[in-house]
């Protein structure tokens, strides 16, 4: 069964830099995830940087993220694919976010966001490719 989880739960109010909960992905078959960052509210003159980090132990997440989502300024949804199929040591994922605010008023940044991951199902080896279908017609 495909995994579906949130690294940043829906309607989370982000007002300071932080880390999300650690999620165990060791039961994932494909180890490939469709990521959706949705920003539902924000104020002007601020930015949000979100990244996804991996760990073998659930404790040490290293010095470099597995995925950096492009910097966000406005409401909307950004979609990306995270593929850790070649990183067999990665058993846990966690989101990290950094907020930046500039301007003259209210120095506290604020975003309401969600980062949801859906496992991409593994492709069946029995599914014929287009090339195989065309070769069979020749």
What are these regions (language model features)?
Residues 10, 63-74:
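Solvent-exposed serine/threonine-rich low-complexity stretches and specific carbohydrate-binding patches
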Residues 1-30:
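Transition segment at domain starts
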Residues 41-46, 105:
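A short beta-turn/strand-edge loop motif at beta-sheet boundaries
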Residues 30-37, 86-113, 118:
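Noncatalytic modules at the cell exterior or secretory-pathway interfaces
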Residues 21-25, 76-86:
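Exposed aromatic-hydrophobic patches
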Residues 2-4, 8-13, 102-138:
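C-terminal interaction-tip segments
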Residues 49-53:
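Beta-strand signatures of extracellular beta-sandwich domains
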